[in-house]
């Protein structure tokens, strides 16, 4: 019971704390930050290629990023579940 309560408090703290840390700060993507650093270090640098698809807005970009992560997690956990089920089946036999 004590361990469960402690874990619950930690989860709640992890959810609530980001609202108070760096309040009002600007959050940018790592791609934009990398681009500005490259331009500062090597202004003559030219990208190798252009993106195949440029999302219309930041919201769509976030949606696609989230969908990609969700699909990846689904594949990983499907494989883990399949292996676990196969192991249980083999243990019973």
Swiss-Prot record:
Keyword Transmembrane helix in record: yes
- What would be one Gene Ontology cellular-component term for the protein? plasma membrane
Residues annotated as transmembrane: 5-25, 63-83
Keyword presence, Ion transport: yes
Q: Which UniProt keywords apply?
A: Cell inner membrane, Cell membrane, Cobalamin biosynthesis, Cobalt, Cobalt transport, Ion transport, Membrane, Transmembrane, Transmembrane helix, Transport
Major location category of this protein: membrane
What molecular function does GO assign, one term?
A: cobalt ion transmembrane transporter activity
Record's Pfam families? CbiN
Q: Where in the cell is it found?
A: Cell inner membrane
Family per UniProt?
A: Belongs to the CbiN family.
Q: What does this protein do?
A: Part of the energy-coupling factor (ECF) transporter complex CbiMNOQ involved in cobalt import.
Name this polypeptide is given: Cobalt transport protein CbiN
Source organism of this protein record:
Salmonella paratyphi B (strain ATCC BAA-1250 / SPB7)
Gene that this polypeptide is encoded by: cbiN
